[in-house]
A protein has these predicted regions:
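Conserved sequence signature across two-component system core domains
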Residues: 8-9, 34, 52
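Short hydrophobic/Thr-rich beta-strand motif most characteristic of the beta2 strand and flanking loop
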Residues: 27-35, 43, 200
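Acidic catalytic/metal-coordinating carboxylates
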Residues: 36-39, 59-68
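Active-site beta3 strand of CheY-like receiver
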Residues: 47-53
Length: 220
């Protein structure tokens, strides 16, 4: 299967560099480029890509607005991989809320870019470790929630709630399996059921819900 990609970035040099890297792969094909959010929406409508590489800061409609439009209401759409820099932390949380499936620093090495594209195309979520730390620092500064387990999570069984807590901490299936003394297959099955029950697109949205609800706290 070939992964169809749209590149949305207002800098032509960045788009050209990304295309050169991606088009060298047998399983990835760049089907369109866009210089702003409006052009990205048109390219997605025309080419139906699997993944959109989305810059945040673009003229006219920015990448955050474009992501919200693409994924509004949780409807099916391409997986959005946000390209960001260390100066754009304030946008990351909003992009997570909008439904982006992955976040990658623009200065990441070639191998990390290819891994990220393949990971989100496969239906998984990806968050650069450096960005994870910065997001957790932001959550630390927020006042803790005192609402208890939200109604949305009450649909989960006790075991599913344990697995969800692991997902919300960003732990892998293998790590959750070791924590709960379960098989990887069982954890994978629980994770799929949890995302479906909670109407979440992927694990990144599970992280958002876990921290927003106060079920998981940084360092907890």
């Amino acid at each position: 299967m070939t992964i169809r990609v749209v590149i949305a970035d207002d800098q032509a040099m960045v788009r050209e560099g990304l295309r050169l890297i991606l088009d060298l792969q047998n399983d990835i094909k760049v089907v369109a480029e866009a210089a702003d959010g409006h052009a990205a929406l048109r390219a997605v409508a025309e080419h139906r890509p699997d993944v959109v590489l989305m810059d945040i800061r673009m003229p006219g409609m920015d990448g955050l607005q474009a992501t919200e439009r693409l994924l509004r209401g949780g409807r099916p759409g391409p997986r959005v991989l946000v390209l960001t820099t260390f100066g754009e932390d304030e946008y990351l949380y909003a992009a997570m809320r909008a439904g982006a499936s992955g976040f990658l620093l623009k200065d990441s090495p070639r191998a990390a870019l290819l891994h990220a594209v393949r990971t989100v195309a496969d239906g998984s979520a990806l968050l650069d470790p450096a960005l994870t730390r910065r997001l957790l620092e932001e959550w630390v500064r927020r006042p803790p929630s005192r609402a208890g387990v939200p109604e949305q999570l009450r649909a989960l069984s006790p075991r599913e709630l344990e697995v969800f807590a692991g997902l919300a901490r960003g732990r892998s299936n293998a790590e959750i399996a070791a924590d709960l003394v379960l098989s990887d297959t069982t954890v994978k099955s629980h994770a799929a059921h949890i995302l479906a029950k909670l109407d979440l697109r992927d694990r990144i949205q599970a992280v958002v819900l876990g921290y927003e609800s106060g079920l998981v706290r940084p360092g907890g």
